[in-house]
Amino acid sequence: MVQWKRLCQLHYLWALGCYMLLATVALKLSFRLKCDSDHLGLESRESQSQYCRNILYNFLKLPAKRSINCSGVTRGDQEAVLQAILNNLEVKKKREPFTDTHYLSLTRDCEHFKAERKFIQFPLSKEEVEFPIAYSMVIHEKIENFERLLRAVYAPQNIYCVHVDEKSPETFKEAVKAIISCFPNVFIASKLVRVVYASWSRVQADLNCMEDLLQSSVPWKYFLNTCGTDFPIKSNAEMVQALKMLNGRNSMESEVPPKHKETRWKYHFEVVRDTLHLTNKKKDPPPYNLTMFTGNAYIVASRDFVQHVLKNPKSQQLIEWVKDTYSPDEHLWATLQRARWMPGSVPNHPKYDISDMTSIARLVKWQGHEGDIDKGAPYAPCSGIHQRAICVYGAGDLNWMLQNHHLLANKFDPKVDDNALQCLEEYLRYKAIYGTEL
């Protein structure tokens, strides 16, 4: 009896795989015969364009797998939000993320994997084709988070460098390799480092990807760096439009530092057993008498900016100087953004300070700033949980989030609130195909 059940399961999986493969072929054939990028262009209002978008959305839609009203959640309907929160509490114990083994099995057939996971495998507009984006993705755990992030930002004209922490488990590394082997424009960084929290290694991971991305044949225009707890809140088309509006400028947090942060670069820090430690050794002043600024690890940088990070001798001197500081990613980029020799930079004057809310790089809710907006707080309390004083978003944060101009937000975790992620996935997929909100 057990053998019969296993045989039935195998036949079912084989049939499902065949169906998905045939559906993919049928979709591609349909598009070759009737649809092209002109028909998908959001500026076109022809009936043929609507027909093509309907076909595409029916095949690629990512509806939430639970009985929740994602349209209501993203619009801020309180009843829909409450239902999503209650639903998340009911199923949280049952929800188990996909494992490394799951992805190793699923990616044995790449076409089946891409079809089942509903990756968008062709450009959705000429404008997007002509404006490729480069991504650095620095990850160390939670394979499902990585795969869902990749699916959300993936477009065939873009280029993606994935840096896997050298100390990550081998099964995780193998699962990442298996996933990216299915895509010609996704690759693992040629040099991997052992990433230590708040140390130089986090910056080095991004620099390694920058070098590899510049050597690729893809003529990308802008660089975005991401981590495994990020997720986009804009479609690729919206990102392209936002990046075009920068007109060669960069967008990253860069502000005059508070006094308590100056210790981070005034003293030497060293890594001991994968932990960063403060020493009593004072550092020399920064090169070229540079004024130090603070920001965060995540940037939106032009290709010229990235080239100057790696090639300009002045940039290289600053890089060497910050290597033994605390959390250098939070002052290196911010300081380079105010350096006169850097393309797209801005002057040192405080009037040019850019906060995390003004920059488009990353939307983060800091626990210390949450509160009553009517009483002056920048944003309402987190509807999820907090991790290292940062909000891990819940469904109740989505409406606020989608009203902001940022390209990506942080942090997300399906084990905390998968409904938040599922509704965001549904929203973004609808926006990508139709250009309008869910």
Curated annotation (Swiss-Prot):
Keywords per UniProt: Disulfide bond, Glycoprotein, Glycosyltransferase, Golgi apparatus, Membrane, Signal-anchor, Transferase, Transmembrane, Transmembrane helix
Catalytic activity: a 3-O-[beta-D-galactosyl-(1->3)-N-acetyl-alpha-D-galactosaminyl]-L-seryl-[protein] + UDP-N-acetyl-alpha-D-glucosamine = 3-O-{beta-D-galactosyl-(1->3)-[N-acetyl-beta-D-glucosaminyl-(1->6)]-N-acetyl-alpha-D-galactosaminyl}-L-seryl-[protein] + UDP + H(+); a 3-O-[beta-D-galactosyl-(1->3)-N-acetyl-alpha-D-galactosaminyl]-L-threonyl-[protein] + UDP-N-acetyl-alpha-D-glucosamine = a 3-O-{beta-D-galactosyl-(1->3)-[N-acetyl-beta-D-glucosaminyl-(1->6)]-N-acetyl-alpha-D-galactosaminyl}-L-threonyl-[protein] + UDP + H(+); a beta-D-Gal-(1->4)-beta-D-GlcNAc-(1->3)-beta-D-Gal-(1->4)-beta-D-GlcNAc derivative + UDP-N-acetyl-alpha-D-glucosamine = a beta-D-Gal-(1->4)-beta-D-GlcNAc-(1->3)-[beta-D-GlcNAc-(1->6)]-beta-D-Gal-(1->4)-N-acetyl-beta-D-glucosaminyl derivative + UDP + H(+); 3-O-[N-acetyl-beta-D-glucosaminyl-(1->3)-N-acetyl-alpha-D-galactosaminyl]-L-seryl-[protein] + UDP-N-acetyl-alpha-D-glucosamine = 3-O-[N-acetyl-beta-D-glucosaminyl-(1->3)-[N-acetyl-beta-D-glucosaminyl-(1->6)]-N-acetyl-alpha-D-galactosaminyl]-L-seryl-[protein] + UDP + H(+)
Chain positions carrying an annotated carbohydrate: 289
GO molecular function, one term: beta-1,3-galactosyl-O-glycosyl-glycoprotein beta-1,6-N-acetylglucosaminyltransferase activity
Gene Ontology annotations of biological process type: carbohydrate metabolic process; intestinal absorption; kidney morphogenesis; O-glycan processing; protein O-linked glycosylation; tissue morphogenesis
Topology within the bilayer: Single-pass type II membrane protein
Spans within the Lumenal topological domain: 27-438
UniProt family annotation: Belongs to the glycosyltransferase 14 family.
PANTHER family named in the record: BETA-1,3-GALACTOSYL-O-GLYCOSYL-GLYCOPROTEIN BETA-1,6-N-ACETYLGLUCOSAMINYLTRANSFERASE 3, GLYCOSYLTRANSFERASE 14 FAMILY MEMBER
Protein name: Beta-1,3-galactosyl-O-glycosyl-glycoprotein beta-1,6-N-acetylglucosaminyltransferase 3
Origin organism lineage: Eukaryota, Metazoa, Chordata, Craniata, Vertebrata
